[in-house]
Amino acid sequence: MKAFKYIVPAFAVVSLMSCKKFLEVQPVDSVSDGQTIVDKTSAETATRGLYRALSADGYYGLSFQSIGYLSGDNVQWTGSQSIVQQFISHNVRADNATIASVWSSIYATINRANHIIAKVPAVTDPLLTETLKNQLTGEAYFVRALAYFDLARTWGGVQLALTPTNSATDKNGIERSSLAETYAQVLNDLIAAEPLLPETTNRYRATKKTVWALRARYHLYQGEWALAETYASKLIGDATAFQLVKPYSAFFANNAVATAESIFELSYSSTYTNGHRNQWQPPANNGTRQWAPNDVFVGLVNDATIGGNRSTLVAKTTQGLWYGNLYYRSPATDPAYVLRIAEQYLIRAEARAQLTKLTDALTDLNAVRSRAGLTASTASTQGDILLAIENERRIEFAFEPHRWFDLVRTNRAAGVLGVTDKNKYVLPVPAGEVLIDRSLEQNFGY
């Protein structure tokens, strides 16, 4: 089997209750994959549908994000769905329903982007100006870049479907690309997106600034430290648009949306809700508490010298049960946080530490710590600073999709989580996908 080429690192769950089944019901404001984009109205509607796909339960609305935090070391399974434990114990099976949902949701998002990229430039409606054509096409390139980035860090090299299709099986027969080729496609799409997009601040839609933020993350994953520093600096230097809001909870508490903390977030409504709330909130708050912060994390985040004012990430019932409180609104209109300015500070801190710019690295790290109400880090050596950044990211992004991917990309999953089998650093390709497409190879070890 040639599967190793799909998973070599570049730098070296599904809700079974109250699931909206987004992919089975076409949103009223989206264009179906088979519908022609013929004018300004249908082009804009297709773009709204693209963001809906990105925010679906199977993607940023729940399941993809849950893989990132369940597979780390902050969360425990507390509910009725045993499928969750497969991620926590790092024994994910190929028939796991969550990975099937995530795989299909991400490819559905890619296909919506492909339709826009292929069709919008050819529309002749005079109401669809060249500027707007460029913007919509650039947004599609950005979303496709994000989607392939997420596929790459979850599964390794994947099938690169770059033209629109009318059914999920239309990509059958496309062989998997290598991890390097998959990441190259991410970069190609980001490069294509940037000149098409406006240099404005829009926290709900892609702009040049959104591209820069994802490029900073991309280059961090590639170990391209100077480029990671450069792109993160573009966002950090734009203080009129992006700031570390204080206190920490200001970006999510009191029904806050689109704060200066947010570079890119996804919105929800009373009729199109965020799936996270139901999984995190306890029955007393009309949730199911399928998972919860574990005892170690509760101790860390409530330690005034470690968590600082980030202790607002957790809360406790009158019965003494701890639960995550990042997603708390009723109805579940909480945003999904895709790119935050805090991440850019910690990306730049890590990149600078790797470049031995230790004083500058500490400045960025301490900016995040200061916002959390903490004193400056006492780390002084390169190794100590990198470890301090790793620990800061653990708390800062505890319930966002970072911890597992951070430990894998830095080769720390074995030392921190005890996951010594590197085959498990990527997930199995969903069994159903392999069964219907003989050209699709399973990841090694599954």
State the predicted function of each range.
Residues 20, 157-158, 187-191, 197, ...:
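Aromatic-residue-lined binding/catalytic grooves and analogous aromatic/hydrophobic interfacial grooves
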Residues 44, 82-155, 192-201, 331-339, ...:
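Conserved, well-structured interaction surfaces
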Residues 3-4, 18-67, 437-446:
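Acidic, glycine-rich segments characteristic of secretory precursors and extracytoplasmic regions
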Residues 75, 82-84, 227-341, 382, ...:
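Hydrophobic-face positions in mid-chain alpha helices that act as interaction patches
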